[in-house]
């Protein structure tokens, strides 16, 4: 049998319970470039916590004015009048040198500067009210420490107890250096990291846990954030998640959708007043802030207004836009997002009909047009999960990574740190997977027992029916995957209702994945089984790919048989 080594994400059942309760209060953290969230599991339910200002989505922003440091929503308010002293989008700068800085999203705040080869921000602060303002360098590491410390304080205020650690989700594209830098910043902030889990794993875990459904499936997780988008194809089998492929675009997200509205309204304002508000930093900041609100309203309604007092040269601005016009204006950006999903499926060497479920996560995924684009890519049997789909998400797409991290935190919070570290060691996480299905023939159909991408070792038990007479002969095959195409003829057109220019519809092609037996790898024969008896067949594959098969009549009559491949 052919095997391949693939990174698999272990669930908490892989861990061993420690005698001590080293971590009693463990939270889940989603640390985004633009927003962050905190989640905690209490009495079996994981919820996103609100900070002292009542915000569940906490802006990842720091701003400085005089001797004051502002954080979150208060800091976001400073972007209009104090942008040069505000620090944003610093998460993805962690673990990078200034030479590695090829793209950043700090266009409307303090720009990154070179700090002895590292990335930092130049701000002006006062130590107290009586001292003179002076320049200070705040590195991306220091900004992350301060932000994470504020999140920890908010969690402790809400829970009324000290937080002992966290599980944090990170993008698949994060390098080892970025992961280590994030852990370092969290530790310095007084928030020990028990485990870093990938964003798509957190998304799936949030939904699987809330719905208490654990079935084998192949899932596309399309995470459209504020500044970046990441799409992953994930195999979920036997409680293990394996990322089969992942692609990302570091310049595609909600900000590009906001830009669409900014340009739309700016052109309208310029046409009426002869002034382009985009040429003035403060006017642009005010318009962007309003467009963020307008964008959110369009996610739920068909029309949204935009109003900015004194947008430029003392002139007020009032306008509106409907969703149809917005979708048209944003079509290029939305199509890029859809193309990223297609690219991920192709990278996994799959077809759209191989995908069981598509989950749209992240704030930008609230755009209803994205859901309709997914419905045009995938067949009807693929379940689309979004805030506006036929099978809607029961959770806020912006909170899925935080909730998934909170779920994992509740599952491993009382485990020993050494056991957690051992369970995520490369030898445990990088495990072999099947590259071809294994199963048996049942009549004219092939029944897959172990599907492609099953993590090894694996064990399954199935039931087969003995023939009416004679010995039970059970061949076990390694199969090859193929595509079955069924053509469905269109319904005939009623001649009385048909128009002369009506074109005859083409037959619809329905594609489905099938497995065809190719290589016989084992045979089980029960010579003296009762006619039509139920036979319990147990197949087990070890980490080296060796198959062991055993069979026994469930009525106890006959001989038990056991064998294995070489």
UniProtKB/Swiss-Prot annotation:
Query: What keywords appear on the UniProt entry?
Result: ATP-binding, Nucleotide-binding, Phosphoprotein
* SUPFAM superfamilies, sorted: Actin-like ATPase domain, Heat shock protein 70kD (HSP70), peptide-binding domain
Name the GO cellular-component terms: cytoplasm; cytosol; nucleus; plasma membrane
Q: Which residues carry this modification: Phosphoserine?
A: 86, 500
Q: Its domain of life?
A: Eukaryota
Sequence positions that bind ATP? 39-46
GO terms for biological process, alphabetical: 'de novo' cotranslational protein folding; chaperone cofactor-dependent protein refolding; protein refolding
InterPro entries documented for this protein? ATPase_NBD, HSP70_peptide-bd_sf, Hsp_70_fam
Pfam families, per database record: HSP70 (PF00012)
* GO molecular function list: ATP binding; ATP hydrolysis activity; ATP-dependent protein folding chaperone; heat shock protein binding; protein folding chaperone; unfolded protein binding
Q: Report the sequence similarity comment from the record.
A: Belongs to the heat shock protein 70 family.
Q: What PANTHER family does this protein map onto? A: HEAT SHOCK PROTEIN PDR13, HSC70CB, ISOFORM G-RELATED
Q: This protein is called what?
A: Heat shock protein 70 homolog C57A7.12
**Native species:** Schizosaccharomyces pombe (strain 972 / ATCC 24843)
């Amino acid at each position: 049998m052919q095997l391949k080594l693939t990174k698999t994400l272990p669930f908490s059942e892989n861990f061993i319970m420690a005698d001590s309760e080293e971590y009693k209060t463990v939270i889940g953290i989603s640390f985004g470039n633009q927003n962050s969230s905190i989640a905690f599991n209490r009495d079996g339910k994981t919820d996103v916590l609100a900070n002292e200002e009542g915000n569940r989505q906490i802006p990842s922003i720091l701003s400085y004015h005089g001797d004051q440091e502002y954080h979150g929503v208060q800091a976001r308010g400073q972007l209009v009048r104090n942008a040069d002293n505000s620090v944003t989008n610093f998460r993805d700068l962690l673990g990078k040198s200034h030479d590695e800085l090829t793209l950043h999203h700090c266009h409307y705040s303090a720009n990154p500067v070179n700090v002895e080869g590292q990335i930092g921000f130049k701000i002006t602060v006062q130590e107290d009210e009586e001292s003179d303002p002076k320049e200070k360098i705040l590195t991306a590491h220091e900004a992350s420490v301060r932000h994470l410390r504020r999140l920890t304080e908010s969690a402790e205020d809400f829970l009324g107890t000290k937080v002992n650690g966290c599980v944090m989700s990170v993008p698949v594209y994060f390098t080892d250096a970025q992961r280590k830098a994030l852990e370092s910043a969290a530790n310095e902030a007084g928030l020990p990291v028990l485990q870093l889990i990938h964003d798509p794993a957190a998304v799936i875990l949030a939904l699987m846990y809330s719905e208490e459904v654990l079935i084998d499936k192949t899932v596309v997780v399309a995470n459209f954030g504020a500044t970046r988008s990441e799409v992953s194809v994930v195999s979920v089998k036997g409680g293990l998640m394996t990322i089969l492929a992942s692609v990302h675009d570091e310049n595609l997200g909600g900000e590009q959708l906001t830009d669409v509205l900014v340009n739309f309204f700016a052109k309208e304002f310029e046409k009426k007043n002869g002034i382009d508000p985009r040429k003035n930093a403060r006017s642009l900041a005010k318009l962007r802030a309003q467009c963020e609100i307008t964008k959110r309203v369009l996610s739920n309604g068909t029309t949204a207004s935009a109003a900015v007092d004194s947008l430029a040269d003392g002139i007020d601005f009032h306008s509106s836009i409907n969703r149809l016009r917005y979708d048209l204006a944003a079509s290029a950006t939305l199509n890029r997002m859809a193309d990223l999903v297609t690219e991920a499926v192709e990278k996994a060497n799959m077809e759209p009909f191989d995908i069981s479920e598509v989950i749209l996560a992240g704030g930008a995924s609230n755009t209803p047009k994205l859901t309709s684009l997914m419905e045009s890519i995938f067949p009807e049997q693929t379940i689309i999960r979004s805030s506006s789909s036929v099978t809607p998400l029961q959770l806020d797409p912006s909170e899925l990574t935080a909730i998934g991290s909170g779920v994992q935190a509740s599952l491993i919070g009382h485990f020993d740190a050494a056991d957690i570290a051992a369970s995520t060691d490369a030898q445990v996480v990088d495990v072999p997977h099947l590259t071809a299905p294994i199963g048996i023939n049942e009549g004219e159909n092939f029944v897959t027992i172990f599907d492609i991408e099953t993590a090894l070792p694996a064990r399954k038990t199935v039931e087969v029916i003995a023939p009416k007479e004679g010995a039970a002969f059970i061949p076990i095959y390694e199969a090859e995957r193929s595509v079955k195409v069924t053509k469905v003829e269109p319904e005939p057109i009623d001649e009385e209702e048909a128009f002369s220019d009506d074109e005859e519809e083409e037959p619809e092609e329905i594609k489905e994945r099938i497995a065809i037996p190719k290589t016989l790898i084992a045979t089980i024969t029960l010579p003296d089984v009762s006619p039509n008896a139920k036979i319990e067949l147990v197949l087990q594959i070890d980490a080296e790919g060796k198959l062991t098969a055993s069979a026994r009549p469930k009525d106890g009559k006959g001989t038990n048989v056991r064998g294995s491949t070489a």
